[in-house]
């Protein structure tokens, strides 16, 4: 089996396993599957869970797409690849819980290959996972980062620190001067050693559930009221702003003629903006700002 097919098979299995785990913890709703084809090449399967007991919306998509020419978002930092043919596969997810005390989360693992005249000119892995709480709890954030550190450990002492820092820098809203959440891991252009890099991608993909599900279990029955729900919807606005203004995956998908429904499944089903909103000093809502600055979470 060639390298691309090995990655593809892993990713489809990962999607299946994550869906099964989410359905089990939700206990009410199930994922609906939408199979799609892309005229320019390839296709995918988008799965959406709606109106569950735990999740307002959980979306997880697998795609295997190709094209005759790289879009600008992919070749901007690799000008030598401009005009190359390409093929990419990946799994991307965003989960929006009902309860404001459960963080929103995002994860992505992907593989990209570019060719010219039938010869591979570049191939690399990318991905990571990050956490966006509205009412953060130190225990949860520390668990998230300790899980990330543990899965990075076999790949060198500097791996966690480097990819945590990359995550903090990538998921940053410059126009708001704040991070999107409390970070996690982010990596791109990892293409020096296929076997080692593929092993790391698998560690990140497999580690996501270990990082997230214990937090869901701890917070899913926490009581909340209208004020907490309103703040959750307001903060979801930051999620929308990041995805539509900065996110490379969103821009790549839209610029490459990707399927808009699948690309934009990351957006929350409900969201609100409020001009000039300021939380009450000393409130739980005001406390969030202290978490939107990169810091060491390992304790």
From Swiss-Prot:
Catalyzed chemical reaction(s): coproporphyrinogen III + O2 + 2 H(+) = protoporphyrinogen IX + 2 CO2 + 2 H2O
Transmembrane regions: none
PROSITE patterns: COPROGEN_OXIDASE
Enzyme active site: 106 (proton donor)
Subunit note: Homodimer.
Gene3D superfamilies in the record: Coproporphyrinogen III oxidase, aerobic
Site (Important for dimerization): 175
Known function: Involved in the heme biosynthesis. Catalyzes the aerobic oxidative decarboxylation of propionate groups of rings A and B of coproporphyrinogen-III to yield the vinyl groups in protoporphyrinogen-IX.
Enzyme Commission numbers on file: 1.3.3.3
Pathway: Porphyrin-containing compound metabolism; protoporphyrin-IX biosynthesis; protoporphyrinogen-IX from coproporphyrinogen-III (O2 route): step 1/1
Coiled coil, from the record: none
Positions contributing to substrate binding: 92, 108-110, 257-259
UniProt superkingdom: Bacteria
Region (Important for dimerization) residue spans: 239-274
One cellular component term from this protein's GO annotations in UniProt: cytoplasm
Protein's UniProt keywords contain Cytoplasm: yes
Known cofactor(s): a divalent metal cation
One GO BP: protoporphyrinogen IX biosynthetic process
Lineage of the organism: Bacteria, Pseudomonadati, Pseudomonadota, Gammaproteobacteria, Lysobacterales
Listed name of the protein: Oxygen-dependent coproporphyrinogen-III oxidase
